[in-house]
Amino acid sequence: MLSELRSINSYNAWVVVFVAVGTIASAYGLAIIGSTVGEPGFYRYFGLAPKGTPGYDHTTNMVGALNGVNSAGAIAGSLLQAWTADAFSRKRTIQLGSVILIIGGALCSGAVHMAMFLVGRFIAGAGSGILTCIVPIYQAEVSTAETRGAMVAMTGVMYSMGYSLAGWLGYACYFTDPNSPRASFAWRFPLAAQVLFPLIVLAGSPMLPYSPRWLLQQGRREEALSVLERLHETPEDVQHIKAQQEFDLIDEQFKLDQTLSLGRRFELFRTAPNRRRALVASLLMWGDQFLGVYVMTNYGVIIYSNLGVTGSIPLLLNACWNSFTMIGNSWTAFSVDRFGRRTYLLTGTVGCIVSLIFLCALSAQYLGSDHLPGLRAAVFFMFFFIFWWSFFMDATQYVYVAEIFPNHLRPQGVALGLTVFYLASEVTLVGAPVALDRIGWKFYLVLIIPSACYLVTLYFLFPETKGKTLEEIGALFGDTNVATVTEGQRMEEGKNNTAELEKPEFASPEKE
């Protein structure tokens, strides 16, 4: 870990927060369908039968398809960014994802038949997949070791904000008269709003710096050092000593990677350390998805309706549920660097599993009855679940998957993790509406059993990464060729840096 002499500066904070708006765009695009399926006008426009009427089986299949094609698009986007992030830069990939999401959102909001809507959902999913992958990569690469957890956790904070906005806008539009000529406004306007955030990112993206690690890989050394100096300058380190130290560390790791010929195809699976990283990333994202958070987010309205909640209240509960995640993710951003990634993942998983067990038991006992205390208790455990997810899991997963891979494999590694994430969502989201209708409470067992296995893998396979540079994390996975700084060197450098800062004749590295 680099010396703690340095703290975050305002420019670094602005870069991280602004690029996280791309995560709002991604989350909103994924979540808005959860509000859409709660709008009566949506069912009428596309000729879908509501719950309790003949033809509802077809409706559940179509609702599952709307989420399925979105996840399929997200998989395509995740894989595409694995190439574009290295070929054209992280910055250009952020711009690409924004453009694609704008196109998809426009098609969804203007859809005149279901085929057009499905195509729009696929394209919007591709844009979301790109942004969900590339934003935490970029944030990790412009952050310091001491602040990386908080910086990348902004992905989770903004993700929850996107879901919250989707929930509240859907609730507000519910009160549009379904018999009026403007009835389609209730579902078209929330869908159209998803283009706003990628437009903001696209407009402001020219002001973003290129990733210093990507610049170094392209041989643009002076520009890389200049970016590091601007990102990490503080009043205590006006001579840019720490920026130079980090530059040297990145440069040394890049040279080691080159000497080991690490640019080969399928490098992600060639060595034992890389295979372990790939396994950990895949287990993390698959396991998190099977905890059921996307099921509750996208089908919360349906779940609340099954629990006897009627009218606009399911949409209101869904909006409140999503809003609560903002509090939890904000907590993670300020605390994950102190308590650690592994600790949070273990704690959150245990809490989520316990919540699912109680939700399953209460649903088994009271689903379909008029026993209000039992049904309300089931609703409570929906909110108890989101406490554990948002305070410990949501933001932490993005921090962890973005930091465990070396620089030259980070886009591919994160793409693998997020591809697995969306594959798992394909399984859960496509099957959930049919399963909730056909087998009811038994569906929760499909989530509980894999989640218990996931908890075991978390305990035995996931190392703690807090406080280490991206280059030093490699040693945790068994890399022997790692550019690092020993503890003794750190202490000595800290003394030398302090002494040098007191000398008026100290010459700082030249800026570009």
Model-derived segments and spans:
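Alpha-helical transmembrane bundle of multi-pass membrane proteins
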Residues: 1-232, 254-512
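Short intracellular "coupling" helices and adjacent cytoplasmic loop segments at the cytosolic face
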Residues: 231-244
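Cytosol/matrix-facing amphipathic helices and coiled-coil assembly/linker segments
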Residues: 243-257
